[in-house]
Amino acid sequence: MIGPVHPYKGGIAHYTDLLCRALREDGNEVQLYTFKFQYPKLLYKKPQKDMKSSGFGTNDADFCIHTLNPFNWIKVAGRIKKQKPELIILQWWHPYFAPCFWSICKLLRREKILFVCHNVFPHERFPLDRLLTKWTLGCGRYFITQSKMDARDLLSVKHDAVYRVTPHPTYGMFCKQGMSMQKAREQLQIDQVQRVLLFFGFVRKYKGLQYLLEAMKLLKERDFKVQLWVVGDFGEDKEEYVEQIRAFEIGDQVQMVEGYVPDDEVEKYFAASDLVVLPYLSATQSGIVQIAFGFEKPVLVTEVGGLPDVVTNGKTGYVVEPRSAETIAEAIMDYYINNRREAFVSQIEKEKDRFSWKTFVDTMMEMVRRD
């Protein structure tokens, strides 16, 4: 299997670690190949590794892939070939990896190749992305997509793809301490009776934070008291959000925690919150939803991409119009005024099997064995 793993940052590194563990628990022998060099600083200026966290159980990965060195790709392909694999699994999420992955796959063209598609196309599109994606995914035989939208995108570049659509599994591994809401709020110095919303993860333009801040303004105008925590690394200048908070006069309602959150600190933010909000403008699927479900936290998402596939409106959370501060504000008020928490949590518990890693692995292996 090829993909990022700990100590690389981000949800896909967590995902690769957990998929490896699930495949091994299913009785498969798995060798992980990951990056010794992932992105140049020109593309990713901040530190790419999180050395503070302990990871989630895979400590035998081979850090051998240099994404910009063609001679390295030949060497890596030879190393994989010597293992005589029955199946090669690659994590796919961005065309930056196209030259590297295409070359390795072409050198291993006689092997069975499966791509796990986190996004068939990148969130932030650019002129050559479709060509690079078609070029690389054309090397694959099998595909896992995690939303119906991504399946449609896949078929637009690979008409004969053998694929399955199965949802992103739940991230339950952050619940290390079983931290109570009371303890989490004590650590974060949040009043125990405060209403608390959470926006978590890398802050990007497509994630729609500006509409959530506008919703906070509407709630203030309606004298509905609630506190929003924005926790994560800003991939762009945060000043526009700071200015928006200032203009809306909601500084007393918004707490910003800037920076990448180490794995060991994720728990307290989710444990302290009532509702996790993802006001995205575009999406295929989201690991943040599955972190929230791992903590049995309801979510508020927008009706974009694959988010409605995993959130059942009125049962495990809310699905609202994108780019609409009004519908976000209305859903937040409904959650608290009508005390939806208990009913939503009960439904989240019932859907655990649907989002389990075992279900994911069973779906993947059934596809490969049937073909």
Residue locations for each model-derived region?
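Conserved donor-binding/catalytic core segment of Leloir-type glycosyltransferases
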Residues: 191-207, 213-216, 229
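Acidic donor-binding loop of glycosyltransferase active sites
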Residues: 268-286, 297
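Glycosyltransferase donor-sugar binding loop
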Residues: 36-39, 200, 227-240, 259
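N-terminal strand-loop element at the rim of the active site
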Residues: 3-9, 20-82, 150, 155, ...
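Short hydrophobic beta-strand element within catalytic cores of glycosyltransferases
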Residues: 298-301, 311
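Nucleotide-activated donor-binding/catalytic signature segment of Leloir-type glycosyltransferases, i.e.
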Residues: 241-264
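Conserved acidic donor-binding segment of nucleotide-sugar-dependent glycosyltransferases
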Residues: 313-314, 318-325, 332-339
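Donor nucleotide-sugar binding/catalytic pocket of nucleotide-sugar-dependent glycosyltransferases
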Residues: 138-181
